[in-house]
Amino acid sequence: PTTIGDFIKAIGDGTFAKEIDDIRKTEDKGARGNKKRELLPAVMISGLQGGKDSSGFLHSGVLQMDFDEVKDLEKCKSLLMSDSYVCCAFISPSGTGVKALVPIDGGFHKECFERARNHFKGSYELIADESPKNPESLCYFSHDPDIYVSERSASVVQWGGGGVDAFSDSTAENLDTAVTITTSIDYITPKQGNSL
């Protein structure tokens, strides 16, 4: 396992800059995808396999949102950076999309995904990829020296069970710790990723 904080740090400090540069120079989308799986490790942003719940999955309380094939990357990232629900945003490994991390109530992952997807579509006309609806979906490392990490995000814990958007200072303060320090997530090496 690794932490979301380590994942974010690696994206910002260029741990995989060489591999990302190689991937982004590849014009064919299929070949780019193959290189990504071949060269990069991946994580499950939303938690750990073999966790404490009945399904064997321990949720991190963080949802990954993917916005692929974006026409204007900087505008998309800027919109996400201005959104009070987003705690982190960065350019995807392909260089053609933007990823955002959103704190949620992990007990209602799919419901939170639906609410988040509708929020981003309704607010910014951004169409989210469906893959992260599955809490075990993979997120590959990327490189973005200008990765955005919120100092304070609104909590969307209530996007799940209660169905009400809630902005709570206490959960917003906890978010900084959960996202940058303590949340453990599964880490898949490139070799393991090829077998998935």
Where are these regions (language model features)?
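DNA replication initiation modules
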Residues: 1, 9, 49-71, 104-196
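Signature for HUH/AEP ssDNA processing cores
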Residues: 1-96, 103-112
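Short Gly/Ser/Thr- and Asp/Glu-enriched loop/turn motifs at secondary-structure junctions
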Residues: 91-98, 133-138
